[in-house]
């Protein structure tokens, strides 16, 4: 295994030594973006709000981007909305991207007052009412977090005029969730007041969004109320394969002590619900425990992948793969490198790491650029245009990276895009001898794709939304013309 890991890393280094290498250190306003096999299609400044999660939804004959935001900063706790002329706490941006070259900003929906992680409305998921078992067929539902204290559901059938449907309140540290549109089951990342961890899972039936029904609380044994001893690392987020796949992949830890937990969905939903250690263990199939150096921010399943190298083998021609993405937390490399990992879970109770990927720091002097450098998240769309062929990883000051993962044992970078900074790009600071030393750099925070083959990246440092497309030989990896 160690040989494969080293090979994957060294292959990435060799690839990046080719054309288009990013070699500049400090970004300056007016300089062009740095790009290889990607090009800019369109932008929106998102009212200079710190952005977290983009979700792209095909809504009738339109394509709408719903973008969650972090809370405001010390300097600007509530930016002015040019559409209303009022200062509004960061919330949700709603942007029409039907023409990706000319995004139209439709609405800012304010979130919770508060700065950074204490405010905003970071997470967004969308389900059509006609897809949900008992939803209003004319509705389009947006599930979002509200600061750290609640989850909200809005009707965004008219995306410029959202209507609040309901709120699940009385929580803390709400964060990244997953919503199955065909069943209505939602895995809500929350902090329940009596649990021993900052974040765990609350499973809800949101098939009728106007009447949420709680199913159960879930987490790792030792996190539940009344338990003793060391508390296992907190949840970051789940991804479910729904009833057909009958699996939920939970990622615990963000930049340290990561755990991939593979869970039987049916047992999770229908097993005993009291949060005892035995009941929490019951639906678990396996865990993959990572190094103390690395977390599990995103756990993206790619099941039944045909491996060309194994095509003539009697067994194991296809493999079940989960991509695990860590999150860099600290500025200017003041932590272990946060990376991308690929796990083979074909033998579910014996998952194993098979490869990894990182951006070579020397390719852009990224530790000196300012802000965070390292992985954060991947696209989560399972649309066929890219699924099991190419993934996109946000890498903070190294922009977004495109990986050819058709052979997940040897992931290969095939493109990147680092946006140019603007006058809105916020500084990032570190303490040197007790004083702030600040630099301005892109902080590509999250990435998503749509069925048309466009990429959407958003910036944590207030630089807005960039809509991209693949160019050159990288398009062939996805089968794009």
What are these regions (language model features)?
Residues 1-5:
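N-terminal secretory signal peptides that target proteins for export/translocation
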Residues 8-20:
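Bacterial N-terminal signal peptides
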Residues 23-481:
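Feature marking well-ordered beta-strand scaffolds used for ligand recognition
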